Design a protein with these regions (language model features):
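Conserved catalytic cores of ATP-dependent inositol ring kinases
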Residues: 1-387
């Protein structure tokens, strides 16, 4: 199940292709249980164990966007192919990777700064689109005690051969609204709470072409004349009319959750309430600068049924509504499409204790002395026999 975001089309078809997708496997996220936003990132594989973060020994397997394992490219002697390069006054060691299964046809590079050991990644697609991962400090998830142990490198920016570019910005977790008096938060410090970062804005549709000069002494920086802006509202934007700038306190979701697959705790306190899409045409009298064009409003199960006892444990996305906006003589006119509603198969839990007749115990395993000890393990079905 997928839900494409209503992004305004960019020039030459260069538009971030983003969609919400549902899969019951990944668990909870910033869109409730099962939903996630399909964005590009490079992360460490955790299916067979915790990451070791010994990158010089290739102790971990990297994954591109959760799909393909990346393997290092070797030279004729069997050693890793590496290339030194200095860009913007920083010396790097560049190593090269390719997907384990062919078909992506992309050049994938890991750039490690010689002086700090901090790395970022770069990929060049077969369509000549360059993408940088963890190029900005906030586009990563790292160990709070060691910033060189980066678990996930998220997309920072991308551009094509025609000068079209897109920039992604992230918001750091800063602990606003967290009730430290709760038992679940008692042993957490400000540093451990601030590991998670949240995608906040996506800018694209630059007026001036973007061609970064890798041989220049200093970096020119990203364009500032973006025509389109997508904002993820975590409840920190006003209701009517919302603006691109956060102007409300950051609310805490009803069921914060943690994952420790990175080898350290990554705790998520926020949840996306809606997407806001702005057009920036200052010369247009009917539009102007940062004009709200449309939104995608999300409703969760705890908002639909506040008294549901499952709310402190998990919440589901139950509806998504696309709304269009038009500015008419200073008045904001809105019109919404019918809501897209979602229903889920709920687990059937048997809270009672049932009795089993003696005739049905004949084929149950027993110990040598006729006594069987059982471990009561959560909701797993268990039979307790008394001899």
């Amino acid at each position: 199940m997928s839900l494409p975001l209503p992004m305004s089309p960019g020039r030459s078809g260069f538009t971030p292709k983003l969609e919400l997708s549902y899969d019951s496997g990944p668990g909870n996220g910033i869109f409730g249980f099962g939903w996630k936003l399909e964005t590009s990132e490079i992360t460490r594989k955790t299916d067979k164990g915790l990451p070791q973060y010994c990158d010089s020994d290739e102790s971990d397997v990297f994954i591109l966007s959760g799909l393909e394992d990346l393997v290092p490219i070797l030279d004729a002697t069997g050693a890793r192919m590496m290339l030194p390069r200095t860009v913007y006054g920083t010396s790097y060691r560049i190593s090269f990777y390719r997907p384990r299964i062919g078909g992506l046809f992309a050049r994938i590079e890991r750039w490690v700064a010689k002086d700090t050991g901090i790395s970022h990644w770069r990929s060049l697609s077969r369509d000549n689109v360059t993408t940088l991962y963890r190029y900005d400090p906030t586009s990563r998830v790292a160990d709070p005690t060691d910033p060189t142990k980066i678990f996930s490198r998220r997309i920072s920016r991308s551009w094509d051969a025609k000068g079209n570019a897109a920039a992604y910005s992230y918001a750091d977790e800063y602990g606003a609204g967290i009730n430290q008096a709760l038992a679940a938060e008692a042993d957490r410090t400000a540093a451990t709470c601030a590991v998670q970062t949240y995608l906040k804005t996506i800018q694209y549709g630059n007026l001036e072409p973007y061609f970064p000069g890798w041989t220049a002494a200093t970096e020119a920086g990203l364009p500032s004349d973006w025509m389109f802006l997508a904002v993820l509202d975590y409840g920190d934007h006003g209701a009517s009319p919302p603006t691109p700038t956060s102007d409300q306190p950051w609310p805490v979701r009803p069921e914060p959750f943690s994952t420790c697959r990175a080898g350290f705790e990554i705790r998520t306190y926020r949840r996306v309430q809606r997407f806001l899409f702005f057009n920036n045409f200052p010369q247009e009298p009917t539009s102007g600068a940062n004009c709200l064009a449309r939104s995608l409003d999300l409703v969760y199960s705890d908002q639909q049924a506040p008294a549901d006892p499952r709310n402190p444990i998990y919440t589901f996305l139950v509806s998504a509504t696309e709304t269009g906006y038009r500015h008419d003589s200073g008045t904001l006119v809105t019109r919404s499409m019918p809501a897209l509603e979602f229903a889920y198969s709920q687990p059937q839990i048997q809270p009672g204790v049932l009795s089993l007749d003696r005739e049905s115990l004949g084929n149950l395993p027993e110990g040598l002395d006729g006594t069987r000890f059982s471990q009561l393990d959560g909701a797993i079905s268990t039979i307790i026999a008394d001899h």
